[in-house]
């Protein structure tokens, strides 16, 4: 019997109906490789293998061994590459699509890693509902939402109750999808025009991410007050105020009220 490890944030999805909904939610992959983070008990992995070749990253050696045992009992061959590695260091040479029931405690980091990886062309992932809502809200209420919509098209799909897992978490989970959008990627890469496209895209995303950390450092304070405290941007405060004037926005505007962060950041970086 496999016992979930709290240290790895393990909650195994066991409800067949939700497993099937996840597989059905996958968009056409075309020539993209399918990458899974976390093999768990292998239930989702086996359903995916019924349709696609698959590479799975799993840090827990006991779960890897359990998956190998399950595969031996299957009546048909499956095309699975089981990488016994930490997914925080996921690196692929070819374009791929990511799917996962992510561990709560590192879910945000893994999603952001996928956003900034040019080889990742999209993701279908489950996180704590609160985290999913932060990524999927359509306005600029938080930095995660701005980052998600800056890189692709974002869709909140469905909620998953605690009863669908073993052991049951204390909160609801949600499944959401992000499909990378080439025009949005081009806009991000244009922030750093001196590099190759993939390098510029990654660096552009990281530049926006760092800028947003400064902008949203104290969400209830004004944007200008937050940037005054930033080592990187406090010297650009006059340009921020110039931008707000050009956009007919008051100097008292908060970070959540900025409509176009890429436009603001480009303005600050030029000249």
UniProtKB/Swiss-Prot annotation:
GO cellular component: cytosol
Binding site residues for S-adenosyl-L-methionine: 11, 13, 38, 58, 86, 101
Keywords: Cytoplasm, Methyltransferase, RNA-binding, rRNA processing, S-adenosyl-L-methionine, Transferase
Family matches, as SUPFAM superfamilies: S-adenosyl-L-methionine-dependent methyltransferases
Domain of life assignment: Bacteria
GO MF term (any one): 16S rRNA (adenine(1518)-N(6)/adenine(1519)-N(6))-dimethyltransferase activity
Catalytic activity line of the entry: adenosine(1518)/adenosine(1519) in 16S rRNA + 4 S-adenosyl-L-methionine = N(6)-dimethyladenosine(1518)/N(6)-dimethyladenosine(1519) in 16S rRNA + 4 S-adenosyl-L-homocysteine + 4 H(+)
Subcellular location(s) of the protein: Cytoplasm
Enzyme Commission (EC) number: 2.1.1.182
Coiled coil stretches, renumbered: none
Keyword presence, Lipoprotein: no
Any Pfam family hit: RrnaAD
Stretches that traverse the bilayer: none
Main location group: cytoplasm
Protein function: Specifically dimethylates two adjacent adenosines (A1518 and A1519) in the loop of a conserved hairpin near the 3'-end of 16S rRNA in the 30S particle. May play a critical role in biogenesis of 30S subunits.
Family, as annotated: Belongs to the class I-like SAM-binding methyltransferase superfamily. rRNA adenine N(6)-methyltransferase family. RsmA subfamily.
Protein name (record): Ribosomal RNA small subunit methyltransferase A
